[in-house]
Each structure stands twice: as C-alpha cells, then as structure tokens.
Amino acid sequence: MTEKEKKEMSRLEKAQAHHNHKNYFIFLIIILTIVYVVDELTSNVRGAVDSFTICDLFNTTYGSAEYNNASGTLGLVTTACYLIYLISPFYKSLADKYGRRLFLIINTIGMGVGMLVSILSHNVTLYLVGCVIMTFFIPNDVQVIYIMECAPKQHRAKLCSITKGIALISVSLLGLFVKLFVNRDNPGTWRNVYIIPIILAFVIGIAAIFLVKETPAFTKKRLEYLNMSEEERAEKERAEKAAREAEKKKNSGSVMNAFKYIFTHKQTTAIAIVAVLLAFSTGYTGKYQNMIETGIATGVMTADASETILMFYPFINGIFTLLGGFMTDILGRKKSALILGAWAAVGLGVFAYGCTKAINPYITGFAYGFSIAGLWSISDMIYFMITSESAPTEIRASVVGSMQLLGMVGTGFNMVFNSLVQMIAGAMKLPFVLTVTYLPLMVI
C-alpha cells in the first residue's frame, strides 16, 4: 500500500466513524439542502433578470427593434451552449471513481464560478462563457445522490421531496433581490441579483470541504479495495474488465434497439410523441420574465407588481410540486398526468392574461407557479415513471435515456422557436404568441 493510499484509508475510516452519529446526518441534510438551494438559484437567476441583462449588454431598451434582435440572437447562441451536455455523462461517471464528496464540492463552487464570470462580463462573449459554466454544473445533482446513499431507505423519497420543495421555494429570493437591488433606470444593476447566490455557493462549497464526509456506500466500497492485496486487486480488475466487456457486448446497439422498441410499440410511440410535445411546450418557462416585463412596458402592471409575482410564484411551485408527487401515488399515472396537464394549461392561460391585463399580481404569480408545478411534475412522470414501466427490463435504462434524448430535441426546438418569435413578432407579442403556441400542446 502506497503512502497516498494510507492517507486515503485514514480519511475514509474517519468518515466512516462519522456516519453513525445522528447529529452528523442532521447537519449533512442541512448542508445538502443549502446546496440544493444554490442549484435552484443558479438555474433560475438568468431568467429572473433576462430583460435587464440584454438591455445592459446590448445597450438597448426593452421592446425596441434592437432589443428584439439582440434577444433572439442571444437565445440562438445560448441554445448552442447546451451542447456542453454531451460531455456530462463522462463527467458524472468520475464520481463513481473518485467519490461523491469531491464532486459535490466541485459542482457547488463551479456554479458560483459560472455566476461570477457572468457578472464580471461587460460583453456578450464573456457572459456566454459564464452561461456555459453554469449550464455544465447545474444538472449534476450530486446532492440527490448523497441523500440516496446516506439516508435510511424508508426516508429517502421523503427527504428528497422535502429538500427539493425547500429549494424550489427559495427561488422567491430572486424576486426579493430584484426588488432590493435592481434599478430599472440602470439595467447594469442586474449583476447585484447574482451576488448573494455567488457568496452562498462559495461559502457552502468551502464549508463542505471541511464538514462533509464521503457517502457510506462509496466509503465501504473504496475501503474494501484499499484493504486488498496487489493480487486481489489485479483479480478484481480482471473480473470487472470482463464484466464490462460482457455488458458492452450485450448492450451493443442498445440505443438503436431502444429507439426501435420505442417506435415499434404503440404505447412507447405515444409516450415519445407526448415527450417531444411536452418538452417543446416548456418554452414559455424561459421567457416568463420577458412576459412580465411586457406588462410593465404596456402599462398594465407596475414594477412592484412584477416583483410580487417573482417572489410569490416559487412558493406555489414548491407546494404544488409536493402535492403532485403525493397525487401520483394516490391516483395513478394516467389520471395524474391528465390533471397535471390541466394544471399547466390553466396556469399558463391565467398567467398570460395577467401579463396583458391589470389583475391582482398574486393571482398572476399563483397561476405561473401552478402552471410550472404541473409541467415539471408531468415531465418527471413521462420521462421516468411511465417510460420505465412501459419498457422491458433488459433495455429499460436505454429506453429511458433515449426518451430523455427526444425530450432534449423538443427543448432545442422551443429555444429556437422562442428566439425567432422574439426577432419576428417582438417582445410585446410574447404573451400572446407563446400562449397560443404552447397552451394547445398541453391540452393535447
């Protein structure tokens, strides 16, 4: 055993000793919840100040021809940023080799770095670099893996739901930050909204270095390996290599087989069509702040009302997302999917109406939160639950992965569509055009 391995073993043994302390688990859940909050803030911060960012970087005013062209062009370029997802599976696999703790820390600090680069930018190029960094680190969700590997089996789903609900509700902070820190006469103040999320990302990421231990599952597996002799390690590596080769041979062409299965079976073909339409219909979630700004620009909404919407909708989203999970268990998949689709459609209709007519901002905020709660709940159901239950065991993982790939295609289309709408119809027409386009898809 090398000196490096001895140090690693000592560290892992100390971590193992912590796993049985009740107070450590409670403390760990608190840290993981804050990481989840950072994740949600990073995911939503760009959308919360989208119009201010464009006005600042392109030196234009909301609703002008220059703004519409700039917003559309930036949207098309930003769509290309999502190509970074192509290397995401390879990055995620490193957590199996080097441990969850390291990547919990890297992802959390990485989100902070992405946001920091974005606010330091005074040109579009550097801003896009920040967007790419944020986009890369957001979807990894190591905090969820931590909960699944550290929590007792009977409490895992409950803890995942609670931490997710808290994180969703925390997005209301962005509305508060817009109210406190953004000066509408100085669009460059959008950067102030990022400051607290950046600080939170760095503080909790650095704190995790000293306070978070490796997960019990990885610790046990790694200690077993370190305690092996050289001969045992060599034998284990040969066995694992043989298993990988056998699995590779077994699954050769598995993606093609999955697509073949999807489009040769009535049930999965229908799911695939719904999955693409659903992904396409999520397009309005990327333009909600612009839809709200249209209300201000046309004089049907005050700045205070818009900030109320931004602060209120996350509470509704968090509450109804939790309710949607319980409803699925009680009513079953099909009934729940129909109800959740109705939530999304009705919510979008009322939200769009609230952006064009003078109604109570709490109603408008409720409608948007209600809509996206239904949308994301049905998304999880379609891509994971229903797809998984409709595929045979031997290709189930490949079918689920292929269905998610189809969803990404739908998402790419909606981003391009949104950008073209912005360039052709203009910002002032967004509430009408997006609602007329996306609402019928939800009904279908």
Where are these predicted regions, by residue range?
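Hydrophobic core of transmembrane alpha-helices in multi-pass small-molecule transporters
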Residues: 125-138, 362-378
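Central cavity-lining transmembrane alpha-helices of secondary-active solute carriers
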Residues: 75-93, 140-143, 311-324
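Conserved MFS/SLC helix-loop-helix module at the cytosolic interface between two early adjacent transmembrane helices
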Residues: 86-122
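Extracytoplasmic gate region of multi-pass secondary transporters
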Residues: 46-48, 265-321, 411-415
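C-terminal ends and interior cores of transmembrane alpha-helices
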Residues: 109-122, 343-358
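Glycine-rich segments within core transmembrane alpha-helices of 12-TM secondary carriers
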Residues: 138, 155-182, 200-201, 403-415
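Extracytoplasmic
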Residues: 27-60, 284-292
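Extracellular/periplasmic helix-loop-helix junction of adjacent transmembrane segments
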Residues: 49-87
